[in-house]
Regions:
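Surface-exposed extracellular loop regions of Gram-negative outer-membrane beta-barrel proteins
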Residues: 415-418, 425, 430-431, 439-486, ...
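Periplasmic-side early beta-strands and strand-to-turn transitions of outer-membrane beta-barrels
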Residues: 172, 181, 207-293
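Short acidic/polar hinge/loop motifs at secondary-structure boundaries
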Residues: 126-155
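Extracytoplasmic beta-strand/coil segments of soluble accessory domains associated
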Residues: 85, 89-126
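N-terminal periplasmic accessory domains that precede
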Residues: 84-87, 106-109, 121, 136-142, ...
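Membrane-embedded beta-barrel scaffold of Gram-negative outer-membrane proteins
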Residues: 311-329, 451-456, 480-537, 542-546, ...
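Gram-negative outer-membrane beta-barrel transporters
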Residues: 360, 365, 402-405, 506-511, ...
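N-terminal periplasmic "start-of-domain" segments of outer-membrane beta-barrel proteins
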Residues: 47-78, 107
Length: 677
């Protein structure tokens, strides 16, 4: 892999530019054409069709028993969200694992089930990585390309959907769409940060007749040399993170055609490329690491939806994904002086389904998916493996007044193949039921109360790494099976036009059988196997309030809390919390939208965690809290709208680790200038 050229460390000139931009941002002078806060302060730079959450949409979701958490484009801007990981951390029940830095691996686990049980969709279709089994969220950090981020933890409101989208939890990423009411829209932005990062981006959308299309891209360079502290007994050593430079390029585009009748065709394509240095885990007395990683991924998908009759609806989609990963680690201990691991994956995916609603009280749907995945590598094993998966889902929904009952039965057939027939992974077949109950006990213009309950079973197939990786994988590994149940309530109250309150609470429980884990076979060799059961129980809650104290002023406040107990449920096991899962997670936010300078504050707090099942002082990760602040302001100059933002991350400079020996950055400053027309 070509070595990334050196990049100068930001100097006094850059810091001076930051200070100047910050001063302009905070200056309370009304520019020509300045809009009031309820227009300039609250309307996002991009006006997106179908993004605003209407009362009817929320009521429909609550009526079906769905537990949905959502951030649209407006909320992403007003809350000071700078990355997808930041957005997900504002949802209750989530925990993001971050290996540090802008290019570090980032995954999300819901209710402690693990990233492998979380489905991530982009543009309505599921993403996948058959080698690792988890989606790297850092590849989708371009918030400017997202119109909406949603989290579903019970069931989806739509009865007809691709079967792969029916997971233990679903994170839905909806890309930017052409704006409503405008023929064209363009947005350009430049972002810089105190760790030596710079990121220009560009998005354009246009509408012409029945067609609308959009295209965009983002480039990121980050030096990544942030400071951290190494503790060695009573001694401490201050260092800067080395070998953490990265470059990443994201390109995306799409088109939508709406027929005069009720058909809609959607096309979407996306490409992602990066080259990065891997800093590795922190070690005492050593600060050098020469690992490199280069990744490429492209995807193209097509979706078509049409109402064949007033009672019959058709949905079809197809998708192809190609990805390539190249890892190098120079070292005299390797044959030839370098360790090279190259992986290439292909996935072809197709889905089709019919939805039938003969009466207002009854609805049924059937969908089927076919997935074929292949992986090749330069290693002795897992060098030519493939898997074909056939999914089915039969669903029905019964509605009687304010009560809704949804039932699903999903079936899965797994067929594995390998160049060496003797080493093929086990085939599998499963039937898994779902049941969701929703009741809108109160629904008025001023108040609402919705109750829900659910039970569902899902399972996770072992990844290619768990089946085939040299001296680690085992072809005999069985899929994990998860059983989940929960009860929830959502209450909404709007006593006046100036005040709105929302309260949501859910109690959940889950049990995973045939847990896939690794056990030592010899001193230096580990092997993947099924062992034991895992139990997850807990509670999540969210409270939010919106206050309009005066004209052109709006106050937003909210808080979330998650309590989860994740332990090994085997009879002979210890009841201790499993690794990397905090028992308590809390967040709080405040925002003030006003005519002068908008303000957003975010606080995240996590209890102690452990890096292994043994709870000792050497495996303990200390509890921590992280405070962030954002200041931003908009100016309107005829058809041009400018936005300047200043963001302070980890304002208190807290030292913490999410993954053992991978320190996170302390104080960071980000400045962003955006122009839209």
């Amino acid at each position: 892999m070509t070595r990334i050229p050196p990049h100068p460390t930001p100097g006094a000139g850059r810091l001076g530019g930051m200070a100047l931009l910050l001063a302009i941002t905070l200056r309370p002078v009304v520019a020509a054409g300045q809009l009031p806060a309820d227009s300039a302060g609250t309307v996002p730079l991009r006006r997106l069709s179908g993004v605003e959450v209407s009362a009817s949409r929320v009521a429909a979701e609550e009526a079906t028993g769905s537990a949905v958490q959502r951030l649209d484009a407006r909320a992403l801007q007003e809350r000071g969200v700078v990355s997808l990981a930041d957005a997900l951390q504002q949802f209750s029940g989530t925990y993001v694992r971050d290996y540090g830095g802008s290019g570090g691996l980032k995954t999300v686990s819901i209710h402690g089930l693990g990233a492998g049980h979380t489905v991530v969709t982009y543009g309505g279709l599921g993403l996948s990585d058959h080698r690792s089994g988890q989606v790297d969220l850092s590849r989708y950090n371009d918030i400017g390309d997202l119109a909406e981020v949603c989290l579903y933890t019970t069931d989806r409101p739509a009865l007809l959907c691709p079967v792969r989208n029916l997971g233990a939890a679903v994170v839905s990423l909806n890309p930017l769409r052409p704006p409503s009411g405008k023929e064209r829209f363009t947005q350009a932005a430049i972002e810089t940060g105190s760790t030596g990062s710079i990121s220009p981006s560009f998005h354009h959308a246009r509408r012409s007749g029945a067609w609308s299309w959009n295209a965009g891209g983002r480039y990121l360079f980050n030096q990544g040399h942030y400071a951290y502290v190494v503790h060695n007994g009573v001694a401490t050593e201050r260092r800067h993170r080395r070998n953490s430079r990265m470059q990443a390029l994201t390109l995306s585009g799409g088109a939508v055609r709406r027929d005069k009748g009720s058909g809609q065709l959607e096309l979407l394509a996306r490409a992602y490329l990066n080259r990065q240095e891997l800093p590795g885990a922190v070690r005492l007395y050593l600060d050098n690491n020469d690992e490199r990683m280069a990744e490429r991924e492209t995807l193209a998908q097509l979706r078509y939806r049409r109402a064949l009759t007033p009672a019959l609806r058709l949905e079809t989609a197809a998708k192809y994904t190609w990805s390539d990963s190249r890892y190098t680690d120079p070292g005299a201990e390797y044959p030839g002086g370098c360790l090279r691991q190259n992986y290439r994956q292909h996935e072809a995916y197709a889905t089709a389904g019919l939805g039938w609603r003969p009466a207002g009280w009854f609805e049924a749907a059937y969908a089927t998916d076919v997935i074929h995945a292949r992986m090749t590598s330069n290693l002795e094993t897992d060098n030519n493996v493939w898997r074909t998966t056939w999914l089915h889902a039969l669903s029905a929904r019964f509605t009687a007044g304010a009560v809704s009952l949804t039932a699903r039965l999903t079936g899965t057939l797994l067929y594995n193949g390998n160049a060496a027939a003797a080493g093929r992974a086990r085939n599998a077949r499963r039937l898994t039921p779902w049941l969701t109950l929703g009741w809108q006990a109160i629904r008025t213009d001023r108040a609402g109360l919705a109750l829900r309950a659910h039970y569902k079973e899902t399972f996770r197939a072992p990844t290619f790494t768990e089946c085939y990786y040299y001296h680690y994988g085992s072809p005999q590994v069985r899929p994990e099976r998860a059983r989940q149940a929960g009860l929830g309530v959502t209450a909404r109250l709007q006593p006046s036009a100036r005040l709105a309150l929302t309260l949501r609470a859910d109690a959940f429980g889950a049990r995973i059988t045939d847990r896939i884990t690794s056990v030592p076979v010899t001193l230096n060799i580990w092997r993947t196997t099924n062992i034991g059961r895992v139990s997850s129980t807990g509670l999540e809650a969210e409270a939010a309030a919106t206050v309009r104290p005066a004209r052109n002023h709006r106050l937003e406040a909210g808080a979330t809390y998650t309590l989860q107990r994740l332990r090994n449920a085997t009879a002979t096991s210890s009841p201790l919390q499993l690794p990397y899962t905090p028992r308590h997670v809390a967040s709080a936010r405040m925002g003030w939208i006003n005519p002068w300078c908008n303000v957003a504050l975010n606080l995240m707090a996590f209890s102690e965690r452990w890096s292994s099942p043994e709870h000792t002082s050497g495996t303990r990760l200390c509890p921590y809290a992280e405070l962030g602040a954002t200041l931003w302001r908009q100016w309107a100059l005829r058809s041009l709208r400018l936005t300047a933002r200043a963001e302070a991350v980890n304002l208190a400079g807290t030292e913490y680790e999410i993954i053992k020996n991978y320190p996170m950055p302390r104080q960071q400053l980000r400045l962003t200038l955006t122009a839209a027309w």
